[in-house]
């Protein structure tokens, strides 16, 4: 009996839009939810990209380190194949944002604990911050879900800023696809300035993951979705690898044409 021919390996994405890099020497915030006992330096991340045929990467600001952005900025200076998001004080000046943009920073990540109140979204300080980000050509990256996301996205609708929602919109919170966050996310996508990351699927119920991805592909389309590995899988290192993160992508977005369109959209968005 003739053995079935081996299928070709899936084409890897061109860009990983969500990963963290750090060393143990970096200062942790007082409220850090975990304290990694290992380093994941930029050199290790780049080696991971190379090993899997991925050309570009986006370093995502991690809550563990607050607004300590020094390591990411140093990585950007050395590696032009990278972009980064940072965390910033809302009082950051337009000049500082322009300098960060020139350095390869493409956006600012916003996240707060799930039970914490949002800032005054209609107040001067917040609106000034968002306006300055938009003027600098940066986006706002939202690591929010549920009611928090449901309240945040409508407040940004008239501010002219692009938004990227992390990790499927944290669908594990408040009702999943029937909750306020998912509904607001779909409405924001329809307005044309919001994208969603197909990332950190290992943090969601495995039995629901494919359905979440299918629904987002149906309503948003691949041009509004980015893939991110969430390497080095903080808190889940024992059960996740970079290869498994890619295999998850291939499983939940099975059409290579959809994956290619996702890559093309991310390359355009992150200005590669």
Regions found by a protein language model. Name each.
Residues 15-19, 57-60, 83-86, 108-110, ...:
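Hydrophobic faces of well-ordered beta-strands that scaffold small-molecule active sites
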Residues 32-60, 65-78:
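Alpha-helical scaffold segments that flank or form the walls of functional sites
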Residues 66-147, 195, 200-203:
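Active-site gating/metal-coordination segments in enzymes
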Residues 22-25, 64-67, 91-92, 115-116, ...:
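Active-site environment of divalent metal-dependent phosphoester hydrolases
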Residues 39-48, 91-100, 180-181, 212:
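Short, acidic/polar
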Residues 1-13, 38-56, 215, 221-226, ...:
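Mid-to-C-terminal alpha-helical segments outside catalytic/metal-binding sites
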Residues 18, 49, 72, 100, ...:
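Conserved, mostly hydrophobic/aromatic
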């Amino acid at each position: 009996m003739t053995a079935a021919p081996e299928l070709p390996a899936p084409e890897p994405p061109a860009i990983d839009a969500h990963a963290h890099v750090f060393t143990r020497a970096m200062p942790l915030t007082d409220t850090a939810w975990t304290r990694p006992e290992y380093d994941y330096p930029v050199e290790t991340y780049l080696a991971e990209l190379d090993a899997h045929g991925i050309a570009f990467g986006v370093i995502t600001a991690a809550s563990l380190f607050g607004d300590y952005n020094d390591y990411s900025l140093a990585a950007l200076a050395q590696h032009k194949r990278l972009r980064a998001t940072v965390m910033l004080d809302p009082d950051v000046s337009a000049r500082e944002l322009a300098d960060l943009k020139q350095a390869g920073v493409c956006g600012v990540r916003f996240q707060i604990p799930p039970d914490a109140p949002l800032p005054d979204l209609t107040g001067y300080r917040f609106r000034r911050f968002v306006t300055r980000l938009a003027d600098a050509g940066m986006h706002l990256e939202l690591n929010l879900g549920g009611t928090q996301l449901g309240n945040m996205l409508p407040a940004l609708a008239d501010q002219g800023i692009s938004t990227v929602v992390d990790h499927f919109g944290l669908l594990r919170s408040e009702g999943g696809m029937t909750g306020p966050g998912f509904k607001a996310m779909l409405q924001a996508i329809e307005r044309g300035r919001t994208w969603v990351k197909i990332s950190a699927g290992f943090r969601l119920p495995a039995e629901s993951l494919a359905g979440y991805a299918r629904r987002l592909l149906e309503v948003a389309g691949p041009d509004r979705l980015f893939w991110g590995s969430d390497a080095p899988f903080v808190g889940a290192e024992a059960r996740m690898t970079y290869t498994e993160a890619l295999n998850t992508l291939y499983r939940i977005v099975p059409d290579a044409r959809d994956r290619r369109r996702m890559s093309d959209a991310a390359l355009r968005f992150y200005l590669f």
